Amino acid sequence: MSIEKPFFGDDSNRGVSINGGRYVQYNVYGNLFEVSKKYVPPLRPIGRGASGIVCAAWNSETGEEVAIKKIGNAFGNIIDAKRTLREIKLLKHMDHDNVIAIIDIIRPPQPDNFNDVHIVYELMDTDLHHIIRSNQPLTDDHSRFFLYQLLRGLKYVHSANVLHRDLKPSNLLLNANCDLKIGDFGLARTKSETDFMTEYVVTRWYRAPELLLNCSEYTAAIDIWSVGCILGEIMTREPLFPGRDYVQQLRLITELIGSPDDSSLGFLRSDNARRYVRQLPQYPRQNFAARFPNMSVNAVDLLQKMLVFDPNRRITVDEALCHPYLAPLHEYNEEPVCVRPFHFDFEQPSLTEENIKELIYRESVKFNP
């Protein structure tokens, strides 16, 4: 099983030596990359995201091609600065085939005078969003293999006491062998944190009902809802719930899975939230087999168990891995968990941008003593 490897073109920019030859500066589409000299030219632009531009480069010391993400003006505001630090700390803690790995943080030449952060990751060829939008044929075997790897990685993440909170196709990275890795942990939280809703600015299409309804306490079930949305999108090649706003988002959800009855609203602590849901237009549950005619019976059954309004009744990651749809791939002994739970104990309310800059510099020194 394979997918076509995209071609991003070459960049003839050979760079300028700076800081006594220890670093090389490249101009990539007007973005200045300052990288250690071990990353040899050319730098090849391969992507641009909300947090920065990404280039491929060769590590001359290891002979590996890597992805370098430049986060420009990384300390311009406290929210973005925390997001960068959070991802660095989390990915350093994790070690799993289906979670993207940080290989290096390029050490800034001056510890107290830098504004950009350059993070080096494993290089992947593409992401699931691009594959879904492409003309690449996707079979049931593709779907099963993608889903299995996503759940296998998510089992590890959840076992580390972490909720990803931003699972969507563009955050699932792939190579030409169809190996999948979960990326972008900038919005992740531990299960015990209480300030969950702060800074929550991601696309609403993959958000669970409890998030749309501002439920103050939520669980790992929010990630399972997102996985269900992704599974449906792989099969239909279009988003399941492309809502323009919160109101339409809830309507699209209830049009498919049916309006919840009172027994499905127990997770809502707020009387106002329950009243709001009850006054929404009522929809019967659609026939999933008719709505998803290209999905196998087992795939449809698993999708239905993921897209459940009440998070307490939603299938868990461990239950999903044991589902008959994944039986050809499921091996309990090959689905490791994280040995130590992760704690965001470095995140104090009094943390300033300068504090975060110092912490990120320290992380870069660990990679480059």
Curated annotation (Swiss-Prot):
Domain Protein kinase: 40-326
UniProt keyword Transferase present: yes
SUPFAM superfamilies: Protein kinase-like (PK-like)
Post-translational modification comment from the UniProt entry: Dually phosphorylated on Thr-198 and Tyr-200, which activates the enzyme.
Keywords per UniProt: ATP-binding, Kinase, Nucleotide-binding, Phosphoprotein, Serine/threonine-protein kinase, Transferase
Modified residues (Phosphotyrosine): 200
Top EC class of this enzyme: transferase
Record bears the keyword Kinase: yes
Residues where ATP binds: 46-54, 69
Active site, UniProt feature: 166
Segments carrying motif TXY: 198-200
Name of one Pfam family that matches: Pkinase
Positions of post-translational Phosphothreonine modification: 198, 203
UniProt EC number: 2.7.11.24
Activity control, per UniProt: Activated by threonine and tyrosine phosphorylation.
Record field: catalytic activity: L-seryl-[protein] + ATP = O-phospho-L-seryl-[protein] + ADP + H(+); L-threonyl-[protein] + ATP = O-phospho-L-threonyl-[protein] + ADP + H(+)
GO biological process terms on file: response to abscisic acid
GO cellular component, one term: cytosol
GO molecular-function term, one example from the UniProt record: MAP kinase activity
Notes on the domains: The TXY motif contains the threonine and tyrosine residues whose phosphorylation activates the MAP kinases.
Quaternary structure (record): Interacts with MKK1, MKK2 and MKK6.
Family statement drawn from the similarity comment of this UniProt entry: Belongs to the protein kinase superfamily. CMGC Ser/Thr protein kinase family. MAP kinase subfamily.
Name of the featured protein: Mitogen-activated protein kinase 11
Organism lineage string: Eukaryota, Viridiplantae, Streptophyta, Embryophyta, Tracheophyta
